[in-house]
């Protein structure tokens, strides 16, 4: 994983005119090889796979009651 390291002290510059204002400093990434994610070398999906989602299993015992109650009454403000 990348570590964020500040530049050297010579790169620090004060921020603002007053002495009570803190300092602003820049930082850089030490290792930027995996910065954009590891999936850059993966092949793009085939045309038939675009937009297809994986099957979702809902494991909630109350889902039938919730769906039934949603169809019985209209949402407020309609």
From Swiss-Prot:
Pfam families: CaM-KIIN (PF15170). Residues 41-68 are annotated as: CAMK2 inhibitory domain. Keywords: Cell projection, Protein kinase inhibitor, Synapse. GO terms for molecular function: calcium-dependent protein kinase inhibitor activity; protein kinase binding. It is found in: Synapse; Cell projection, Dendrite; Postsynaptic density. GO terms for biological process: long-term memory; positive regulation of inflammatory response. Its main location: other. Transmembrane segments: none annotated. Disulfide bonds: none annotated. One of its GO terms (cellular component) is synapse. InterPro entries: Camk2n (IPR026779). Interacts with CAMK2B; the presence of Ca(2+)/calmodulin increases the interaction but is not essential. Interacts with CAMK2A; this interaction requires CAMK2A activation by Ca(2+). Belongs to the CAMK2N family. Potent and specific inhibitor of CaM-kinase II (CAMK2). Plays a role in the maintenance of long-term retrieval-induced memory in response to contextual fear. Modulates blood pressure and vascular reactivity via regulation of CAMK2 activity in addition to regulation of left ventricular mass. Mediates the NLRP3 inflammasome in cardiomyocytes via acting as an inhibitor of the MAPK14/p38 and MAPK8/JNK pathways, thereby regulating ventricular remodeling and cardiac rhythm post-myocardial infarction. This is Calcium/calmodulin-dependent protein kinase II inhibitor 1.
């Amino acid at each position: 994983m990348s570590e964020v390291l500040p530049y050297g002290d010579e790169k620090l510059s004060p921020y603002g005119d007053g002495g009570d204002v803190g300092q602003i400093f820049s930082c850089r990434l030490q290792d930027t090889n995996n910065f954009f994610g590891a999936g850059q070398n993966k092949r793009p999906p085939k045309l038939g796979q675009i937009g297809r989602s994986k099957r979702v299993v809902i494991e909630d015992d109350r889902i039938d009651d919730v769906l039934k109650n949603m169809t019985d009454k209209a949402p407020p403000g309609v």
